[in-house]
Amino acid sequence: MESSNGKEAEGAMKEEKSNTHQEAETVSNAEETKLGSKVGSMSNKEMYFRADKIDFKSWDVQLEKHLSRAWSRDMEVQSTRKEEWEIDLGKLDIRHVIAYGTYGVVYRGNYDGQDVAVKVLDWGEDGIATAAETAALRASFKQEVAVWHKLDHPNVTKFVGASMGTSNLKIPSKSSSSDSVNSPPSRACCVVVEYLPGGTLKKFLIRNTRKKLAFKIVIQLALDLSRGLSYLHSKKIVHRDVKTENMLLDATRTLKIADFGVARVEAQNPRDMTGETGTLGYMAPEVLDGKPYNRKCDVYSFGICLWEIYCCDMPYPDLSFAEVSSAVVRQHLRPEIPRCCPSSLASVMRKCWDANPEKRPEMDEVVRLLEAIDTSKGGGMLPEDQSTGCLCFTPARGP
């Protein structure tokens, strides 16, 4: 009996151990499921990861491959996505040079049957501009294009298109071979606009320095410029570099505003627009003084241009930048209005170049003031060789 009882006790103990083992396996499996293990055939003892066993280098390689594929896909999307102002350079035929500028060359050409001017800009050509400076200039160019391509007005140069690259652009070589062409650097950009055969207003005025302009022509040019600026301001655009050099004439002497290199959408907060932007002699006092400014800086510059159109002369030809800056801001220096200038026109000049921006008229008001001027009785300056000693004539000071 004792032997039989002992065997039964031993069997019960084995059964209990077996049950305990099964329960442990059940708990372990439940924990494995709860942890969401992805190790597959790994045993329970290997559920804990050891940092010294992890191959971080392999992870880096895989991550780099993944990012490279993602970047390549993104670049493919970007390369196929074109801005609405981008043009097909294959349709552009460049003929010859029109002018040289600070950062590039202007060519005459043909785009899809239209007579055009092509401005090719290469900011790294001099080897001085750093990569950061070149990037900033390219961004500025893109801003110019973004402003220009939306404009449509008879007194604003018509924008045709632009390209942030010039890899497909062929420029005739200076060599004698008619088949020889040059390709600008890939970093270069180009903008294409309508070709205006009359050249710049600046050159037109220089050609008329001695004989001057008829009063009717003075008012016509002034109205063209004022209407163009009024349109820009209605679109919340401040040109910021209004000068006769940035105005072009077509075959019928209609004036059109050009060069939006420093134009920008007007900030709602004037303090967001600061810094010296413009050209010596045309810059408003608040701009010269580094103060916040708005569209009224264009009104000031227009006043200087109006004087220049009437006189066919240039303001402050004998003063340095520092002298002009100081005198305009602190001494209220302005060009001297000839005594023979009609009071109606002289009044517009003075209103436009008032030291207080808030007192300057809006450009649409300037348009109305100019339209009200009677040109039937003359009023322009007499040619210099016909001067009879009138105090309104001064010796020519050159272009």
Question: Model segments located where?
Answer:
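A short, aromatic-enriched beta-strand patch in the conserved N-lobe beta-sheet
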Residues: 161-162
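Conserved catalytic-loop aspartate of Hanks-type protein kinases
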Residues: 298
